[in-house]
Curated annotation (Swiss-Prot):
One of its GO terms (cellular component) is plasma membrane. It comes from the Bacteria. Pfam families: ATP-synt_ab (PF00006), ATP-synt_ab_C (PF00306), ATP-synt_ab_N (PF02874). F-type ATPases have 2 components, CF(1) - the catalytic core - and CF(0) - the membrane proton channel. CF(1) has five subunits: alpha(3), beta(3), gamma(1), delta(1), epsilon(1). CF(0) has three main subunits: a(1), b(2) and c(9-12). The alpha and beta chains form an alternating ring which encloses part of the gamma chain. CF(1) is attached to CF(0) by a central stalk formed by the gamma and epsilon chains, while a peripheral stalk is formed by the delta and b chains. It catalyses: ATP + H2O + 4 H(+)(in) = ADP + phosphate + 5 H(+)(out). ATP binds at residues 170-177. Keywords: ATP synthesis, ATP-binding, Cell inner membrane, Cell membrane, CF(1), Hydrogen ion transport, Ion transport, Membrane, Nucleotide-binding, Translocase, Transport. Coiled coil: none annotated. It comes from Hahella chejuensis (strain KCTC 2396). Its EC number is 7.1.2.2. This is ATP synthase subunit alpha 2.
Length: 514
C-alpha cells in the first residue's frame, strides 16, 4: 500500500481548496403583503426583472408586472386561493416560456402550453419565450404568396397574402369565428400550420370548434390554445402571445403558419382588468395607456421573413426558403361601432379588415361581408392571376348595385341599362353566398366568377343562382376535371383557360335549362 507523506496530503488539500467554487448564487426572497383578485403585492424582491416568472409556495407561479421602489405587483398564473399574506416568494431568473414544435399539432393546450385535452403529456422538450421582438425591416420580405380562405367573397375582393395581418371585425353573431374556422379547414393539404387561440370564450364553444376541426380532418395541422371565460384574466392576457410563439416556431424554420386570435377584444378586457387591479392609471374607456402596444407588439410578430433570416436562425440547416406567419385577429364591436378605442387601434395596426354586418347576415347573405368598407392593403400582390383578372369586375358590380339599389327605392321607372345593372348586381350578390364548412378551390371560384363576368348568369333567375352554381360545379368536376386541376396547379389565366371555361359553361347550359 502506497504511503502518502503529510506534505503531499497538504498539497492535495490546497489544490482542492483552490479549485473549489465558493461563489454561491444569491437569490432574494420576498414576502406577500396582500393577495386579491389574482394580484399579489410583494415586499422585498430586489433583483426581479419585468415579466419574470416568480415562484410562490406550493409550486404556483406568477408574472412580475409592476416594479415599484419598495414593492412588486405580480399577477398569479393559475389558482391563488392557497396564497396568503406572509408567505415567501422567490425569483426564478427565467422569463416565461411555452413549449413549441410539431408535437403540439392536433393538441389543445392552455395559455401556458399545458395540455388540457386528456391525451397525455406533450412529447416536445423545446421551449421559447412568450414575449419576443418582431423581426426587423431588413429580415422581412414583401407579401407575395396567396393564403386562400376558400371563401369566394374574401379571396376575390379582400385577398390575403402569407405574412399579412387581416382583421375580421363585426358584431356578435355575424359569422366571424365561422370564417376563421373555414380558413383553417381550407389549409388542409397546403402545408400551412394553423394555431387557433380562443380567448374568453365559453368552454362549450371551444369544444364545439375542436369537434368541427376534427370532423373535417383539420386538427392534424392545428394547435388550439384555449383560455376560456372561466380562466383567470392573466391566462386570457397571455394566451395570444403563447399562440404567437408556437406559430413563430414554424415561420422561423422556413414554413408557413396561420394564427387566429378569437378575439382580441376579450384580451383587451382582461388586460384592462389586470391593469386596474395593479392600480395603473386608467385612460380612455378605462383602458391603460399601453393598450395599443398590447396589440401592436403581438400583431407585428406576424410577418413574412426572408431566406437569410431563416438560414441564420436555423444555423444553415434550411436554405433558400422564406417563412411566414399570417394573422387573422378578430374584434367584436358593439352595435357596429368601429370608432371605439380597441377597434380603431387594431384597424390601424393591421393590413386591412373584413367587416361583417348584422343586417347582411340577417338578410341571408353569408359570409356577411360589407364589400364597400372591407379592404386588403397588401393582399392584391399575392393574388393568383386568375383571381386578379376575374375578381376585379365583381367588386365593381357589387359597389354599383348597392348604389343603384338605394336609388331605385325612390325611382319608379328605370331605364333598361340601369335595370340590367341592378339584375346583374342581384345575381352577383347571390353568387357570393356560401355555406359554412364548404371552402372552394381556386379553379371552382374561377369558373363561377367567369360565368358572372361573361354574362352566363343573365338568363338565370336570381333565386336559382345558388342551385345553378352547385350544378355547374358538379358538372365541371365530372366532365372538366383536367381543366380544374390545371388551374389549381398554376393559378394562371390565359386565352386557352378562358376558352376551356367558356366551353365548360356552354356545354353545361346546353344540357340543362335554367
Amino acid at each position: 500500500m502506497q504511503q502518502l507523506n503529510p506534505s503531499e496530503i497538504s498539497e492535495i488539500i490546497k489544490k482542492r481548496i483552490e479549485k473549489l467554487d465558493i461563489s454561491s448564487e444569491a437569490k432574494t426572497e420576498g414576502t406577500i403583503v396582500s393577495v386579491s383578485d389574482g394580484i399579489v403585492l410583494i415586499h422585498g424582491l430586489a433583483d426581479v426583472m419585468y415579466g419574470e416568472m416568480i415562484e410562490f409556495e406550493g409550486g404556483v407561479y406568477g408574472l412580475a408586472l409592476n416594479l415599484e421602489r419598495d414593492s412588486v405587483g405580480a399577477v398569479v398564473l393559475g389558482d391563488y386561493k392557497d396564497l396568503a399574506e406572509g408567505q415567501k416568494v422567490r425569483v426564478t431568473g427565467r422569463i416565461l416560456e411555452v413549449p413549441v414544435g410539431e408535437q403540439l399539432l392536433g393538441r389543445v393546450v392552455d395559455g401556458l402550453g399545458n395540455p388540457i385535452d386528456g391525451k397525455g403529456a406533450l412529447e416536445t422538450t423545446l421551449t421559447e419565450p412568450v414575449e419576443k421582438v418582431a423581426p426587423g425591416v431588413i429580415a422581412r420580405k414583401s407579401v407575395g404568396q396567396p393564403m386562400q380562405t376558400g371563401y369566394k367573397s374574401v379571396d376575390t375582393m379582400v385577398p390575403i397574402g402569407r405574412g399579412q395581418r387581416e382583421l375580421v371585425i363585426g358584431d356578435r353573431q355575424t359569422g366571424k369565428t365561422a370564417l376563421a374556422i373555414d380558413a383553417i379547414i381550407n389549409q388542409k393539404g397546403t402545408g400551412i400550420k394553423c394555431i387557433y387561440v380562443a380567448i374568453g370564450q365559453k368552454q362549450s364553444s371551444i369544444a364545439n370548434v375542436v369537434r368541427k376541426l376534427e370532423e373535417h380532418g383539420a386538427m392534424d395541422h392545428t394547435i388550439v390554445v384555449a383560455a376560456g371565460a372561466a380562466d383567470p384574466a392573466s391566462m386570457q392576457f397571455l394566451a395570444p402571445y403563447s399562440g404567437c410563439t408556437m406559430g413563430e416556431y414554424f415561420r422561423d424554420r422556413g414554413e408557413d403558419a396561420l394564427i387566429i386570435y378569437d378575439d382580441l377584444t376579450k384580451q383587451a378586457w382582461a388586460y384592462r382588468q389586470i391593469s386596474l387591479l395593479l392600480r395603473r392609471p386608467p385612460g380612455r374607456e378605462a383602458y391603460p395607456g399601453d393598450v395599443f402596444y398590447l396589440h401592436s407588439r403581438l400583431l407585428e410578430r406576424a410577418s413574412r421573413v426572408n431566406e437569410e433570416y431563416v438560414e441564420k436562425y436555423t444555423n444553415g440547416e434550411v436554405k433558400g426558403k422564406t417563412g411566414s406567419l399570417t394573422a387573422l385577429p378578430i374584434i367584436e364591436t358593439q352595435a357596429g361601432d368601429v370608432s371605439a378605442f380597441v377597434p380603431t387601434n387594431v384597424i390601424s395596426i393591421t393590413d386591412g379588415q373584413i367587416f361583417l354586418e348584422t343586417s347582411l347576415f340577417n338578410a341571408g347573405i353569408r359570409p356577411a361581408m360589407n364589400a364597400g368598407i372591407s379592404v386588403s392593403r397588401v393582399g392584391g400582390a399575392a393574388q393568383t392571376k386568375i383571381m386578379k383578372k376575374l375578381g376585379g369586375g365583381i367588386r365593381l358590380a357589387l359597389a354599383q348595385y348597392r348604389e343603384l339599389a338605394a336609388f331605385a327605392q325612390f325611382a319608379s321607372d328605370l331605364d333598361e341599362a340601369t335595370r340590367k345593372q341592378l339584375e346583374h348586381g342581384q345575381r352577383v350578390t347571390e353568387l357570393m353566398k356560401q355555406k359554412q364548412f364548404a371552402p372552394m378551390t381556386v379553379a371552382e371560384m374561377g369558373l363561377v366568377l367567369f360565368a358572372a363576368n361573361e354574362g352566363f348568369l343573365d338568363d338565370v333567375d336570381a333565386k336559382k343562382v345558388v342551385p345553378f352554381e352547385a350544378a355547374l360545379l358538379s358538372y365541371a368536376k365530372s366532365e372538366f376535371g383536367d381543366l380544374l386541376a390545371k388551374i389549381n396547379e398554376a393559378g394562371d389565366y390565359n386565352d386557352e383557360i378562358a376558352a376551356g371555361l367558356k366551353s365548360c359553361i356552354e356545354k353545361f347550359k346546353s344540357t340543362q335549362t335554367w
